[in-house]
């Protein structure tokens, strides 16, 4: 289905840097809880044996880190719970790192259709809002699928998406399961050589203005908007709690709060949380503490995940999971797999869109925001619904 597979490609558009992991010695894939538990141990052993690890973990894997949520993780689905390649090193000057242009005249994605029309969205929004009013949760990230057909070369399509919306945490994954094209602007976490872990939760979205003056006014409004700040602060507090489970007391810091990053179609509010990992923290312990990222669940995290499982029409799969790599020296970097398209061998393409719902959210505005976020994949094409 794709030449040079299996491989994983990472792309930081801000630094014009492409990193390729090709020809894995083996691939660790899990589709059941037993395979998942064994796979995490296999990944840890490979890491401690001096290997590089690159791949992804699906959103539903997060259910397996909490006994109460474990029954929600369906087994033996098309999309694995995780798939990681074991590599000797990143490939040097690999042909996959060379930009490739699409040769086809038709769009890479065709026939996009929202999984929910507005009436369906409103019903699920209203049920979620009832939970908010009852105090079951304070925020939940309600998402819906967009279905399409794909054709052509996924690698060329990946490069064409870069032109549409540059991001720092892009990735193309061709391991087991669907091919993943990820155009994520959000860092889940990174770890440096000294053991400092940092996460950049992204919560709060506004459309771009038509002029620089309009953009400046929109950014100023975002920074002063109590609803946007409240959404972001809830997730910052959640991640402070998550990250404290695996870090040294007294090292937790929030170096950036309510920053705004600008992309071709939207402005996003982002904050930074940082702390020092406890000595000898294992990979599985980091994921058990943090995964999935609180920005794509809600708060309180476990209750929000229960409510979302009840409301959403199917598994998120790779969407809202994490894609990244682990180096032998302990350096790690994973994105939050938002703006991520799953390509299946039969021509199906699926990507999800969503947003954080709080007490004063409005269904119409939230649905419009979902469709705005879908533009990363389909541009200005009409999305049927």
Model-derived regions: residue spans:
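Extended alpha-helical targeting/anchoring segments
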Residues: 1-385
